[in-house]
């Protein structure tokens, strides 16, 4: 749920210092089983991924709005614009570039998961060079995540029983998602009985 890892894991692609430095806001709709996490960076470095695909030079206003729909749908709405360009109160947000990322996370076993992903954009739609650039770099970023997640899986497996994880404010979205998943599992177990 938290994208601050972009700063450390995806430098040179989508990560910049501002991602980790900017606080998040988290909202939870317990009834709908949805978690919303937002990070709005008003003055951020433009990472190569966006500079090369949008043509923006200099600093940007960058928004990351995540929706997690339990149990398995993750949506990332990214807004990128020249620094200071905010969306209008009404009407289309024509001065910004928008990228939509969808992950459909499907567990296979206790230790393996299928992660189906897709990326859409509202700019340079007819530009094959931009399409190829985004496809190649999105794949690189996802594969960086796969490497990190495999290492994390090994770390979790090596933890002693009753290991107490330390959670901090940046984990509120992930903790809310875990809470909802636990509720859904318990409800399923009740139905199965």
Locate each region found by the language model.
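C-terminal catalytic domain of Rieske-type non-heme iron oxygenases
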Residues: 1-193
